[in-house]
Amino acid sequence: MAPTTPLLELVDVHRTYPVGESTVNALRGVSLEIREGEFVAIMGSSGSGKSSLLHILGLLDNPDRGEYRILGRNVNALPEDGQAGLRNHVAGFVFQQFHLLKRMSIVDNVRLPHIYSGLKGDFRHEALESLKKVGLMHRLDHTPGQLSGGEQQRVAIARALIGNPMILFADEPTGNLDSRNSLEIMKILEELHREGRTIVMVTHEDEIAAYADRVITMRDGLVVSDQRRDRVCLPAGPSVPLTLDPHAMMDASRNLSVWQDGRFIGFVQQAFQSIFANKVRSLLSVLGILVGVASVIAMMALGEGAKVSIEEELKSMGSNLISVRGGSARVRGAAQGDGAVARFTFKDVKDISRMHSLVKGAAGTVNGSGQIVFGNRNWSTTLDGVGYEYGSMRAFVPSIGRWFTRDEIRKREKVAVIGVTVARELFGNNNPIGHTVKINRINFKVIGIAPAKGFSTHRDQDDVVLVPVTTAMYRVLGRDYLNSIYVEVRSAEGIDGAKEAVSDLIVKNHRLREGDDSFNIRDMTEIQEMLSSTTRTMSMLLGAIAAISLLVGGIGIMNIMLVSVTERTREIGLRKAIGARREDIMLQFLVESVGLTLSGGIIGIIAGIGISALLAVFAGWAVKTSIVSIVLATFFSAITGIFFGLWPARKAAELRPVEALRYE
């Protein structure tokens, strides 16, 4: 760079602004140079164009026409991210409104520009040095709201200095201060000038402009006066070294990665500061997400629980089973009751058992109700008369005691295997084996306790008494027919063939017509499909509730983020003024949106697990919360935050610095 090259140079710069249907010429062909080490005051009445000139010099705005050069390089044509890099490294800003972030301490406010610098480190030491320069070491733990106006402006100056910028831009730095604080601020600026700092200041007060060594006066968008004061001498201190290449800086800014320089961590911290600063609003905005995630967790817990219950129930029923039950005959359209036509016999059981190529075994059953009494205790229960093969087919062989023998069934012996519920109600913790009980006033000897089965979809499977089928038919219930026949098929592949063969046999034995509905044959696959269908329907219902809740919650998040963008427009302007790129602003608001939805998601996960536990305890429903459901809930929370936060984040990123800073 030649020694005569100015630090800043404007060549025939024009700037117009639309006002309603007309336009205002804020700058009309302004040309000027500012050299290293100058202290320049720009003066003029309201509407003269002085602020517009400062905004262009500080890269907060672009001219419509003309050139703006820094160190001889034309910069007004640079892309937005390139200008952001220059604002961060070349310029420091002091505003009339201070523009400090209320939620941050003054140390964090001062080191804020370094989030966007691409440099690693927390820069606390540099922030302390800047605060020491402006005399605020005794206020380190304070927030802006705890400081006076003069102290807040000193914090703003410290923030402007932390990156050791080439130029300090001050827009009415004393405009909101009393005379004493104004004097203190101007002494600080004067001292910085003596150290070699280039300062460009806008003011409308002559006594403030008197601190500058050069005064430019604006009127109607034109420079009408440019005076250097005779009293001014060269700065006493060394000048700030001009080593920054704007074009190299633009390339560096464009290549910055939020993952490499630690900015992402800063965005996360600031996002949660914003969330916790508005706790009630944040909580209300995530209610939809909370309900949606809780629904997902509860839905999947119920679905998994139902699946486990179905598997356990089918396991308790035995494998590769088909059941043959009596249907309902109809006379003139009126149902005649279960099994009114097809009343099965032991011959049916024997004939089915002889199908050796398809069937491993068959057992007939008869069902009724029974009153069982032991001592002074009695219990109403289900009474099942069953065959010998039933124990192994339906997994009822006792773990305590024994099962019936074929001889006991043939002789119609009065022996019983009782379920766990019956044993508990009649005997408590005592062993019932060998004791005599009365079933419908007939004495029976307890020979075994059936394995625990748990609840099925309609009843407690442990609330049952099993007796030999012949005993039940001829001694207790007084029947000469079977209610149902259970058939164990040799393989799952042979179930369809076995069903067809059994159907043909029943039709033949009972002389029924083809397609007669007086009996039906079912296998466990049909039962499983029926139960699974019910579970799927419930899951779809809960899934719909979850989807609607997530949609409503997402819209709530988008609404609250749009409000947040509006409320924080000046903050966005400040961040852009100190070097934030479009990507930085967009990512910050996206992180905040995702932070909200993840917070709602975490609360929803806890609520969903709690609801599942309550359903298990009070409703007796089977539930099973899985890691998969928690991962899915977290994933959908994050996706909702990204999807519904994208528009507000984009809106924030597209704000122009100068317009955002002026927002009322």
Swiss-Prot record:
<dbReference type="InterPro" id="IPR003838">
    <property type="entry name" value="ABC3_permease_C"/>
</dbReference>
<dbReference type="GO" id="GO:0016887">
    <property type="term" value="F:ATP hydrolysis activity"/>
</dbReference>
<dbReference type="InterPro" id="IPR027417">
    <property type="entry name" value="P-loop_NTPase"/>
</dbReference>
<dbReference type="GO" id="GO:0022857">
    <property type="term" value="F:transmembrane transporter activity"/>
</dbReference>
<dbReference type="Pfam" id="PF00005">
    <property type="entry name" value="ABC_tran"/>
</dbReference>
<keyword id="KW-0547">Nucleotide-binding</keyword>
<dbReference type="InterPro" id="IPR050250">
    <property type="entry name" value="Macrolide_Exporter_MacB"/>
</dbReference>
<dbReference type="GO" id="GO:0005524">
    <property type="term" value="F:ATP binding"/>
</dbReference>
<keyword id="KW-0046">Antibiotic resistance</keyword>
<dbReference type="InterPro" id="IPR017871">
    <property type="entry name" value="ABC_transporter-like_CS"/>
</dbReference>
<dbReference type="Pfam" id="PF02687">
    <property type="entry name" value="FtsX"/>
</dbReference>
<feature type="transmembrane region" description="Helical">
    <location>
        <begin position="602"/>
        <end position="622"/>
    </location>
</feature>
<comment type="similarity">
    <text>Belongs to the ABC transporter superfamily. Macrolide exporter (TC 3.A.1.122) family.</text>
</comment>
<feature type="domain" description="ABC transporter">
    <location>
        <begin position="8"/>
        <end position="245"/>
    </location>
</feature>
<comment type="subunit">
    <text>Homodimer.</text>
</comment>
<keyword id="KW-0812">Transmembrane</keyword>
<feature type="binding site">
    <location>
        <begin position="44"/>
        <end position="51"/>
    </location>
    <ligand>
        <name>ATP</name>
    </ligand>
</feature>
<keyword id="KW-0813">Transport</keyword>
<feature type="transmembrane region" description="Helical">
    <location>
        <begin position="627"/>
        <end position="647"/>
    </location>
</feature>
<comment type="function">
    <text>Non-canonical ABC transporter that contains transmembrane domains (TMD), which form a pore in the inner membrane, and an ATP-binding domain (NBD), which is responsible for energy generation. Confers resistance against macrolides.</text>
</comment>
<protein>
    <recommendedName>
        <fullName>Macrolide export ATP-binding/permease protein MacB</fullName>
        <ecNumber>7.6.2.-</ecNumber>
    </recommendedName>
</protein>
<dbReference type="GO" id="GO:0005886">
    <property type="term" value="C:plasma membrane"/>
</dbReference>
<dbReference type="InterPro" id="IPR003439">
    <property type="entry name" value="ABC_transporter-like_ATP-bd"/>
</dbReference>
<feature type="transmembrane region" description="Helical">
    <location>
        <begin position="543"/>
        <end position="563"/>
    </location>
</feature>
<dbReference type="Pfam" id="PF12704">
    <property type="entry name" value="MacB_PCD"/>
</dbReference>
<dbReference type="InterPro" id="IPR025857">
    <property type="entry name" value="MacB_PCD"/>
</dbReference>
<keyword id="KW-0997">Cell inner membrane</keyword>
<dbReference type="InterPro" id="IPR017911">
    <property type="entry name" value="MacB-like_ATP-bd"/>
</dbReference>
<keyword id="KW-0472">Membrane</keyword>
<dbReference type="InterPro" id="IPR003593">
    <property type="entry name" value="AAA+_ATPase"/>
</dbReference>
<keyword id="KW-1003">Cell membrane</keyword>
<keyword id="KW-1133">Transmembrane helix</keyword>
<dbReference type="GO" id="GO:0046677">
    <property type="term" value="P:response to antibiotic"/>
</dbReference>
<feature type="transmembrane region" description="Helical">
    <location>
        <begin position="283"/>
        <end position="303"/>
    </location>
</feature>
<keyword id="KW-1278">Translocase</keyword>
<keyword id="KW-0067">ATP-binding</keyword>
